[in-house]
Curated annotation (Swiss-Prot):
Function: Participates in the translocation of lipoproteins from the inner membrane to the outer membrane. Only forms a complex with a lipoprotein if the residue after the N-terminal Cys is not an aspartate (The Asp acts as a targeting signal to indicate that the lipoprotein should stay in the inner membrane).
Gene that encodes it: lolA
GO cellular component term of the entry, any: periplasmic space
S-adenosyl-L-methionine in keyword set: no
Protein species of origin: Cupriavidus pinatubonensis (strain JMP 134 / LMG 1197)
One biological process term in Gene Ontology: lipoprotein transport
Primary location class: periplasm
Intracellular or extracellular location(s): Periplasm
UniProt keyword annotations, A-Z: Chaperone, Periplasm, Protein transport, Signal, Transport
Subunit structure, as described in the record: Monomer.
Signal peptide extent: 1-25
Similarity remark: Belongs to the LolA family.
Gene3D superfamilies according to UniProt: Lipoprotein localisation LolA/LolB/LppX
Name of the molecule in the record: Outer-membrane lipoprotein carrier protein
Length: 212
């Protein structure tokens, strides 16, 4: 489940930056600043699965780790707790490494992202082609944008992106079954210097490789 969420959820900021509609950018100064100024970043994340609505919200699972990205299409998303797992893309191929199984899954990057939240964070396709974008509410000082996938063949029915003080604060992903995944970001460094081989994936010794 967690792997599906991240393949569906991790990859979205680069595309958003490259293809965001001008009218929407003018409406949100924080977003415009982030879009034009941040070409790469690294930081930490916490991912929570939430069920219910209103006062009946219940956290059913929590995981955390770190991320690095460089637009377009290059990223490392590393789960550290409660289980280790790695998702890494070099601009062409997405690699998913499950340490417990010692197994690597390879997927073509464009096919893996599509109209998923991942495409908003790290992809390179046309945002307006895949999403309807509108301004959302302000909650606890965080300004939200709401994205609705145009494709019916997607796991999520709504995606929220929250900014505060010019920084990406959170993403909120709601699926067709009413479940919500909340990603919160911290310790983000904008435009860090990254080595040339930062996103080169090396298959761990003895790992099985599956291509999809």
């Amino acid at each position: 489940m967690r792997k599906r969420i991240l393949v569906s959820a991790c990859a979205a900021l680069a595309v958003f930056a490259a293809h965001m509609p001008t009218a929407l950018a003018a409406a949100t100064d924080q977003l415009q600043s982030f879009v034009t100024g941040v070409k790469s970043a690294k930081g930490e994340f916490t991912q929570r699965q939430v069920k219910g609505q209103g006062d009946s919200l219940k956290v059913t699972g929590t995981s955390s780790g770190s991320f690095v990205f460089s637009r377009p299409g290059k990223f490392t998303w590393r789960y550290a707790k409660p289980y280790e797992q790695l998702l890494q893309a070099d601009g062409q191929t997405l690699y998913i490494y499950d340490k417990d199984l010692n197994q690597v899954t390879e997927r073509k990057l464009d096919g893996a992202l599509g109209s998923s939240p991942a495409a908003i964070l790290f992809g390179s396709n046309d945002l307006e082609k895949n999403f309807t974008v509108k301004n959302g509410p302000t909650r606890d000082g965080v300004e939200w944008l709401e994205l609705t996938p145009k494709s019916k063949d997607t796991q999520f029915e709504r995606i929220g992106i929250g900014f505060k003080g010019g920084n990406l604060e959170a993403m909120e992903l709601r699926d067709a079954f009413g479940n919500t995944t909340l990603l919160t970001f911290s310790a983000m460094q904008k435009n860090p210097q990254l080595p040339a081989n930062a996103f080169r994936f090396t298959v761990p010794k003895g790992a099985d490789v599956m291509k999809q």
